[in-house]
């Protein structure tokens, strides 16, 4: 996935995969396969900020496990009911140094919130409705079939490539 990409094509650098690292142009980058964030050695890897984008650790207590293992800050790249939300261009200046775990909301929220804020401040907004068209995600089926395991939304069983699939969103 790093050396060859459907969109960006070939990565024009020498990439060698090791058991616990990637070597890119001679620089070693550690790779971890740990499923428990508390056991990932962030401190010894000298990682200050973890971008939590697995979608599995959106609850504050779960994301804080990265702090236990040595990270100084965690940014959850999905909506979280428990971690404070900060959006660039909207309220990012209110983030305090003491905020160790924050969330950056959903990709949909990030695309609509700055525009909505400008409209609200300039002409006011009484009501609004938003529609989003999202690219295919990893959990969607490429052909019609069963929905992803444990997913209650049967619309997720539809082929992502040939259907417009109305579905839920984490957008605020």
Task: Label the predicted regions.
Residues 1-142, 146-157:
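N-terminal Rossmann-like NAD(P) cofactor-binding subdomain of oxidoreductases
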Residues 148-161, 165, 169-172:
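Long, contiguous binding/interaction regions
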């Amino acid at each position: 996935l790093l050396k060859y990409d459907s969109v960006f094509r070939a990565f024009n650098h020498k990439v060698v995969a090791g058991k616990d690292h990637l070597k890119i142009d001679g620089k070693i980058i550690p790779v971890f396969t740990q499923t428990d964030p508390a056991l990932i050695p962030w401190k010894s890897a000298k990682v200050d900020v973890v971008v939590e984008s697995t979608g599995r650790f959106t609850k504050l207590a779960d994301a804080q496990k990265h702090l236990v293992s040595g990270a100084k800050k965690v940014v959850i790249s999905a909506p979280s009911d428990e971690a404070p939300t900060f959006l660039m261009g909207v309220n990012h200046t209110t983030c305090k140094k003491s905020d160790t775990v924050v969330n950056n909301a959903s990709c949909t929220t990030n695309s609509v919130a700055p525009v909505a804020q400008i409209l609200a401040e300039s002409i006011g907004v009484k009501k609004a409705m938003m529609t989003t068209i999202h690219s295919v995600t990893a959990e969607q089926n490429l052909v019609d079939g069963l929905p992803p395991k444990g997913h209650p939304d049967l619309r997720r069983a539809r082929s992502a490539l040939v259907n417009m699939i109305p579905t839920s969103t984490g957008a605020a």
